[in-house]
């Protein structure tokens, strides 16, 4: 394999997102990585959709906002979000004293971190294999 060909195979390094609430995001990320199977879908588009929908619904639940349950997909994501929100409230009591704006920022930072760890920063080449 030529040097040019080898360089083309190497995945471009993506930097992890930085957020003001990194320490708290680390705690929530660690919980997901150890307890949530939904992070392990085999394709990047599945992971993108699940990260977005589950974490959006988790944020809505934590903020006491209405949650869209109009489709079967919405209800499926909602089930995971209910479990995650309940566990976050129990295991990380500091989340209960945060404002809606702080929770929104925290959950966006968490989504960015999960996208990085499970998609953009992942070395798993199967995520982008068109034949998989």
From Swiss-Prot:
Its EC number is 1.18.6.1. One of its GO terms (biological process) is nitrogen fixation. It comes from the Bacteria. It is an enzyme of class 1 (oxidoreductase). One of its GO terms (molecular function) is iron ion binding. It holds the Pfam family AnfG_VnfG. It catalyses: N2 + 8 reduced [2Fe-2S]-[ferredoxin] + 16 ATP + 16 H2O = H2 + 8 oxidized [2Fe-2S]-[ferredoxin] + 2 NH4(+) + 16 ADP + 16 phosphate + 6 H(+). Keywords: ATP-binding, Iron, Iron-sulfur, Metal-binding, Nitrogen fixation, Nucleotide-binding, Oxidoreductase. InterPro entries: Nase_Fe-Fe_dsu, V/Nase_d_su. Its cofactor is iron-sulfur cluster. Hexamer of two alpha, two beta, and two delta chains. The key enzymatic reactions in nitrogen fixation are catalyzed by the nitrogenase complex, which has 2 components: the iron protein (component 2) and a component 1 which is either a molybdenum-iron protein, a vanadium-iron, or an iron-iron protein. This is Nitrogenase iron-iron protein delta chain. It comes from Azotobacter vinelandii. The gene is anfG.
